Amino acid sequence: IPYSTLEEYWHSFNNVYVLVYPPDKEPTVRDILGDHWDVETNRQLALDKYQAQIQSNPEDAFAWFNLGTNLVYFEHYQEAAQAYDRARELGLPQRMLRYQFGPFFAYFHTRRIDDLMALTEYALQITPNAEEALLWQGWGYYRAGDTNSAIASFQAALAENSNYLDAQYALDFVR
């Protein structure tokens, strides 16, 4: 596919990439990536990129979503929640919460439990067995003081994926 098409589709995934290379090629890969080799620098450059994209196109929902994702990485949850709010206002495809969970983190850490629960309900309507959405639903219940429902959600997440360590941690934490 042409690079322009790849770039267009990749945009909705925060331009995340995974490096796969033989260990003896690490110096070459480091040279190719330059400043992007360092994870913190890479994330800061991504944050800067999406801030600039929003300046040039404030109606780009993916840029707002990606800004939120990078703000979550730096634990700037309040700003991240605001970026996700804007992305949601502009409209996102249903699939956005299948593999990207930044909004759950942002709303949880800003104690916006109603928003967290609304998002998890939305995600579970699309994919009823999504263990990540079940996990965050459980954390929402926990923050709301409903420990029994939290445990049920964490157990449901583990029923979907018995190796889901985050759900096991959550279950152990609330018990």
Segments predicted by a language model, with ranges:
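A conserved position within tetratricopeptide repeats
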Residues: 51-55, 81, 88-89, 124, ...
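Alpha-helical adaptor scaffolds
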Residues: 69-75, 85-139
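Terminal, low-structured helical/coil segments at or just beyond the last alpha-helical repeat
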Residues: 149-175
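Noncatalytic regulatory segments and standalone regulatory/sensor domains
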Residues: 1-70, 74, 79, 85-87
